């Protein structure tokens, strides 16, 4: 699938943006390498359901472009640049990668249903006019052109862009505004943090 940024790089960001993001990144992650645990802690993603935890792990993996188990500064900037400045096509490619849990280049019903359930568990404000099962059925009935029960990247890209309802729903359900706001403002979830961290550690153990 190639680079999901499609050529977008740090050079396209202003020096001010890069400096601010670097300062925040190094403040939160002095080692220069963000682990999955730190990723979850920074965004206040604690005490998650199994579905929500899987979604967070999958999101982390899609931002870990070189697959070394860490998010470094370049990957961090690429991820933020995608969210803040990415075009529809670039975001759809990222959505596809997020849904393609096993990384085989196709999305099957179980993968889509799992991520939709996870998104709703972590973001209750997302669109809920349909159940996760109904939304999954709708997606496949509309854009699984060859009817093989799997969505290729081409089917996903073309189908979603042709259907405004699907595009709007996906955009709302994968709204990363909260995460971006935390990164931009350097906000920390201080209230009750120590107690939740203890609970999270116990849950992870």
Swiss-Prot record:
Residues annotated to bind Ca(2+) 1: 64, 66, 68, 70, 75
Database matches in Pfam families: EF-hand_1 (PF00036), EF-hand_7 (PF13499)
Name of the protein this chain belongs to: Guanylyl cyclase-activating protein 1
Domain writeup: Binds three calcium ions (via EF-hands 2, 3 and 4) when calcium levels are high. Binds Mg(2+) when calcium levels are low.
Binding site for Ca(2+) 2: 100, 102, 104, 106, 111
Region (Disordered): 185-205
Location relative to the cell: Membrane; Photoreceptor inner segment; Cell projection, Cilium, Photoreceptor outer segment
Membrane topology of this protein: Lipid-anchor
Subunit description: Homodimer.
Cysteine disulfide links: none
Signal peptide boundaries: none
Listed SMART domains: EFh
Entry keyword Endoplasmic reticulum: no
N-myristoyl glycine-type lipidated residues: 2
Record flagged with keyword Calcium: yes
Modification type Deamidated asparagine: residues: 3
GO CC annotation terms, alphabetical: cone photoreceptor outer segment; membrane; photoreceptor inner segment
Tissue spec. comment: Detected in the retina. Detected in rod and cone photoreceptor cells (at protein level). Also present in certain pinealocytes.
């Amino acid at each position: 699938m190639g680079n999901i940024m499609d050529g977008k790089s740090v050079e396209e960001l202003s020096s001010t943006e890069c400096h601010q993001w670097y300062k925040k990144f190094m403040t939160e992650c002095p080692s220069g390498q963000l682990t999955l645990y730190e990723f979850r802690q920074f965004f206040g993603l604690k005490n998650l359901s199994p579905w929500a935890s899987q979604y967070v792990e999958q999101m982390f993996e899609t931002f870990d472009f070189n697959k070394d188990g860490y998010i470094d500064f370049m990957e961090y900037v690429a991820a933020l640049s995608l969210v803040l400045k990415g075009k529809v096509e670039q975001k759809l490619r990222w959505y596809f990668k997020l849904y393609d849990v096993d990384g085989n280049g196709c999305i099957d019903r179980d993968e889509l249903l799992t991520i939709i359930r996870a998104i709703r568990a972590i973001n209750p404000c997302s669109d809920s006019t349909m159940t996760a099962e109904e939304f999954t059925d709708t997606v496949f009935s509309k854009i699984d052109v060859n009817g093989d029960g799997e969505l290729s990247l081409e089917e996903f890209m073309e189908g979603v862009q042709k259907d405004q309802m699907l595009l709007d729903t996906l955009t709302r359900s994968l709204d990363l505004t909260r995460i971006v706001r935390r990164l931009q403002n350097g906000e920390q979830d201080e209230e009750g943090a120590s107690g939740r961290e203890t609970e999270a550690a116990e849950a992870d153990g």
